[in-house]
Amino acid sequence: KGDNEATFARRIHDLFTVPQTCIVGYNNVRFDDEVTRNIFYRNFYDPYAWSWQHDNSRWDLLDVMRACYALRPEGIAWPENDEGLPSFRLEHLTVANGIEHQNAHDAMADVYATIAMAKLVKTRQPRLFDYLYSHRNKRKLATLIDVPQMKPLVHVSGMFGAARGNTSLVAPLAWHPENRNAVIMVDLAGDMAPLLELDADALRERLYTPRAELGDLPAAPIKLVHLNKCPVLAQANTLRPQDADRLGISIQRCLENAQLLRANPQVREKVVAVYAEAEPFVPSENVDAQLYN
């Protein structure tokens, strides 16, 4: 027999709000944490305070595993999917590394598997583990961002796709005009032509056109990085030459593109305009779904 949602929300809230608690999961930032926020909202608890108040924080092991594969893969077995690309499914990683994980997707089994994978990274790549853990909050991450110089950083994100290890060098072009937690980044491995040749309206259309519909047109090489969502960012030299080669990333091309951006500062104003005039947010009329209204 389970609890009703109000009781369940109170029990979870009591656990999550213990001071100096770090909530860790596997893809939790994009899924579990959104569920948590909405449950707390529906039951009259602050939907955000649990993740920052009283020195609390959150962290996501999925991007830790992606970063470990891309930047420091030694000591861990990396399984592949049917397409020959690295798989970061928790049940694949545990099997490849000899970790017991019966009943995958059973809540408790996944908790123990997540803890075991975290211990594995901590043991095999302790410096990377400690770096990522210490850079899980937006204040620490903000110290890496140098917008005026567009200083390149290495960024690991599922948005880049497994074919290049979810990794690229990026340059911070500008802060988002409305969201102070978001940085507009340029994917330096991409084609700079859309940024240089298109006006703001055409660039916005290119940005929001699905890749499958672009045909031979190059995608707009820009993405938002939300510093309050535990993104993986590090100094550019964290990406070793041998790992760049393994991932198919040309460091030389990335650095040349960074120079090209610095030589064309008008791109910054154009890209800010793209995000300043994005499609308006449509509020929900469902009272239980108005968290982000």
What do these predicted ranges mean?
Residues 1, 16-127, 132-135:
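Metal-dependent phosphoesterase core characteristic of DEDDh/y 3'-5' exonuclease domains
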Residues 16, 69-72, 98, 136-140, ...:
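Generic secondary-structure transition motif, activating predominantly at the C-termini of alpha-helices
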Residues 56, 180-183, 228:
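Sequence-level motif detector for i,i+2 pairs with an aromatic at +2
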Residues 134-214, 222:
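Acidic catalytic cores of enzymes that act on phosphate-bearing nucleotides/polynucleotides
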